[in-house]
A protein has these predicted regions:
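Acidic/polar loop patches that form or flank catalytic/metal-binding clefts of enzymes
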Residues: 25, 70, 281-282, 318, ...
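Active-site phosphate/pyrophosphate-binding segments
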Residues: 270, 290-405
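Extended redox/cofactor-interaction regions of prokaryotic respiratory oxidoreductases
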Residues: 2, 161-229, 234-240, 248, ...
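Flexible glycine/proline-enriched surface loops and loop-helix/loop-strand junctions
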Residues: 112, 210, 251-252, 302-305, ...
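N-terminal export/assembly segments and adjacent metallocofactor-ligating motifs
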Residues: 2-277, 306, 314, 424, ...
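Glycine-rich phosphate/diphosphate-binding loops that line cofactor/substrate pockets in enzymes
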Residues: 127-146, 200-208, 298, 319-332, ...
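Long, contiguous, secondary-structure-rich segments that constitute the structural scaffold
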Residues: 497, 502-551, 624-638, 643-723
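N-terminal leader/propeptide and maturation segments of large enzyme subunits in energy/redox metabolism
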Residues: 109-120, 279-315, 494-566, 631, ...
């Protein structure tokens, strides 16, 4: 008979063990196991952190009795997490680690690709066969015929970066441009400020005029929201700029709802008003900026009336917004990712990032721009222990943009073509644009597809081999953050269930089977964690492997008053904020509307937004959990009543959403959250949850952004008919 350790623990058993007490937000610890036996039980508590692609990076504690989880709760030692987990993670052990459908043994395909038919095999057989196939491809066509595909499914530096990156660099595989999220935003802010780190999250409480531009913290940055609420209670005004009336927009003092893709024009229009009305901080501009004369000339054509025609806003709205922002102190603009997914994505961030310098907002504590914090960790941690630049830079191989995966898999002119796709920490069948092309590529009989996964995802269904990956409760890791100032260590709470293994161990085994002997391919997880912390940088003062094991997460040792640009100190080539940069084309952020052909305009008149509206998904993670699907309901399309009436569509009608790339079937929901001409579809649902087996990305474009080579997926036009 197999033990629980061999087969995993199903949902009912785990709930019984945990006493059915609440796990996570606001609830006390799950009661520990008790026994009338005289045997002594071993109880331990370890610290960990969320590995998802989220700015919060929550810290948690896991208590076990005899290697069985009895409590999973947020850590109160991290003031940013503040003893609460987000809605997605409160039941993580049941939802992921102990889920009855979790893959716990290697699998080999026995049916057609996409059918989801597999047989169980041993690790020895799986490693032997995959290593042989990879080596054969290398011998015949070179390492570039192999493409690794991963992203933010696990943002741990060990399981997401270290050994996997070293392995693929060692075999000379094609490099993946991981630009699907964040690259355009970063490129834009760097062009203006030279760095993305601005106002720190906790310091938003000192702001008195907060602009949440293209971000929805109540849903996707939940631990920032209490700080925003505190600022509001202290008198701050909350303004949301978003083409969709999000959960956060509904709670704001003012929701400004421009047409999708017009953020650059709006930001330039604000600068026009500020300069025309003399509301700029001329002293700050003279001391710490470059190119204001060119900017003044450039924004002349972005007067309120012209910008109103572009954005769909009233000229009075643009005037009022510009004046209120410029005349409020401290004023803060919070951006994250949202507005990057347009053709002008980087230009939008570039323009918005100029506003704090134009008004001198950086002078004031709580004033400026809040974006990402990852640079703080890049400066302080020993990144070379993770990246081993001498390994990753040799050999220099070609790069393939992850947004263009569908094109790459089907490109007959690509030399060498992609003969092997190795997917981990990602689910590209759902999350990558131009889905039809991606699925067509995954169906190719001569493509070797290997996937490391927890579940039989839509991507895994096309795999030739599936390796069972551990969850964060079962492996070591160290996690920085791109949205907070806390670093976390993740200590395994339990031994790996079944035959699951960490990503790092998978690639160590492959390296050994392929005959490699280089020590950097076999370094242990715990050694990588320790080496990463071996830095004498001031930000890491007082932070050690031992202290992190004790506390879980610690705040970087930053100045009490973090005001990076109060006196300039921009990380640009000049040391100043760049309104104008001759080294970048265009030299000023410019709104360039996407031009659609006349036929496309006529056939696909509606602008599709695919956004994070599901509260309990994290991209496509957790979308296979029954109780979460019950809460979220079936996927739906939000459409303005006037657009619905013009198509004889009533609330609840099943509709077909289509364009030249594909079609999706789902129910219509009449909504005032979108404006006329705009429709909205949630992202994250799996293909099986749609009639027809296609989700939102069957419609999205793989057009690249103006800078950063990100995905302009929101530049998607569609038409809708009632089924």
């Amino acid at each position: 008979m197999k033990s629980k350790r061999d087969r995993g623990i199903d949902r009912r058993e785990f709930i019984e063990i945990s006493g059915k007490a609440g796990i996570g937000i606001g609830l006390s610890a799950v009661p520990l196991l008790t026994s009338s036996c005289t045997e002594v039980s071993t109880t331990k508590t370890v610290h960990g952190a969320c590995y998802h692609d989220c700015p919060d990076r929550c810290s948690w504690k896991v208590t076990t009795v005899d290697d069985e989880v009895t409590a999973f709760q947020a850590s109160e030692d991290n003031p940013y997490t503040a003893g609460k987990l987000c809605d997605k993670m409160v039941d993580f052990p049941n939802d992921v680690t102990f889920h009855p459908d979790r893959i716990l043994t290697p699998l080999k395909r026995v049916g057609d690709k996409g059918q989801g038919a597999f047989e169980k095999i041993s690790w020895e057989q799986a490693i032997r066969e995959v290593a042989f196939k990879l080596q054969s491809i290398i011998d015949q066509k070179g390492g570039e015929a192999i493409l690794p595909y991963s992203f933010g499914g696990n943002q741990g530096m060990v399981q997401g970066d270290a050994i996997p990156n070293r392995f693929f660099a060692h075999i000379g595989a094609s490099q993946l441009e991981r630009t699907i999220c964040g690259s355009a935003a970063v490129a834009g802010v760097l062009a203006t400020n030279g760095q993305t780190t601005g106002v720190l999250p906790e310091d938003i409480v000192h702001s008195r005029y907060i602009v949440l531009w293209g971000t929805n913290p109540m849903l996707s940055n939940q631990h920032l929201w209490p700080f925003i609420q505190k600022a509001k209670n202290q008198g701050a005004k909350i303004v949301v700029v978003d083409p969709f009336k999000s959960l956060t927009a509904s709670e704001a003092d003012w929701h400004i709802q421009p047409n999708p893709g017009t953020d650059t024009a709006l930001a330039l229009g604000l600068m026009h008003v500020i300069l025309a009305e003399g509301l700029q901080d001329q002293d700050y501009i003279d001391r710490y900026t470059l190119g204001v004369d060119q900017l003044k000339e450039h924004v002349q054509k972005f007067d309120p009336e012209s910008v109103a025609r572009i954005t769909g806003l009233e000229p009075e709205t643009i005037l009022e917004f510009a004046k209120a922002y410029a005349q409020s102190t401290p004023s803060l603009i919070r951006v994250l990712i949202g507005m990057e997914h347009q053709a002008n994505g980087a230009s939008a961030f570039r323009a918005v990032a100029m506003l704090p310098a134009l008004t001198g907002a950086w002078r004031h504590f709580g004033g400026g721009l809040m974006h990402m914090t990852y640079e703080l960790f890049g400066a302080s941690l020993d990144w070379e222990s993770i990246s081993l630049p001498q390994v990753l830079a040799n050999p220099q191989t070609r790069s393939i943009n992850m947004i263009e995966l569908g094109k790459a898999l089907n490109d007959e002119a690509l030399n060498p073509g992609i003969d092997a796709l190795f997917v981990f920490n990602s689910n590209p069948a759902v999350t990558t644009p131009n889905q039809s092309a991606v699925l067509r590529g995954l169906q190719k009989k001569d493509l070797l597809t290997v996937v490391s996964e927890h579940f039989l995802t839509d991507t895994a269904r096309y795999a030739d081999y599936i390796f069972p990956a551990t969850t964060v409760l079962e492996n070591w890791d160290i996690l920085d953050s791109w949205g907070s100032t806390y670093i976390n260590i993740n200590e395994p709470a339990i031994a790996p269930l079944g035959a699951s293994k960490p990503n790092s161990e998978l690639f160590r085994l492959l390296a050994g089977e392929m005959g490699f002997t280089e020590s950097y391919l076999f370094e242990s997880d715990i050694d990588i964690v320790k080496k990463t912390l071996q830095s004498d940088h001031e930000y890491l003062k007082g932070i050690t492997f031992e202290s992190l094991r004790e506390s879980g997460g610690q705040r970087l040792n930053l100045p009490e008053k973090w005001m990076p640009h109060a006196e300039g100190n921009f990380k640009t080539t000049s040391g100043k904020c760049h309104f104008y940069d001759a080294g970048i084309q265009p030299s000023l952020p410019t709104y360039i509307p996407v031009t659609y052909g006349k036929k496309d305009q006529e056939e696909y008149p509606l602008h599709l937004l695919t956004i994070k509206t599901p509260r309990y998904f994290l991209n496509s993670s957790h979308a296979n959990v029954d109780h979460i699907l019950e809460k979220e309901g079936k996927p739906y399309l939000e459409i303005h009543p006037s657009d619905a009436a013009a198509r004889n569509i009533a609330d609840g009608h099943e509709v077909k959403v289509f364009n030249q790339r594909g079609s999706v079937y789902l129910a219509a929901r009449l909504s005032q959250k979108v404006t006329r001409g705009v429709v909205c579809m949630p992202q994250g649902y799996w293909l099986s949850q749609f009639r027809g087996g296609s989700s939102a990305n069957a419609l999205t474009t793989d057009l690249l952004t103006d800078m950063g080579r990100g995905g302009a997926i929101q530049e998607t036009k569609v038409e809708i008919t009632k089924v």
